[in-house]
């Protein structure tokens, strides 16, 4: 599931992601927040972007439990409060998009894919490897993260496999990075 909230502000950008993480935690149950803090892999992601001169906060969840515990409470918000900045921000528009497991699996396995993919990261991205953060693109870390997330939400498939990961990395290359 995906929730996009148009925020009535020009004052925040991707650097406030940790503050928005706090907004999520303040709007979900304490019990679920505690469970999330114990997870190695979060069942959601969030980012802030600028689109057509608007500030958009996007929250995506990977399973029904995260949808019910994160997106549903946030979809009720008419404003958010950034505690560290002491800033109250109105939510002026919301859009929700839902896909069920079958739609995702069909899209993943049946949709034709071009030979070359262009991936654009909308916010700074880092991966943890050997206890350190890696800020440069590393195909092994990108693929492993995607495989783990897919496995975490799929009851039918365990996607993570060292042999498959090795083959993906071997058959891929980063041709441009900026």
Please annotate each region the language model reported:
Residues 1-178:
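RNA-interacting cores
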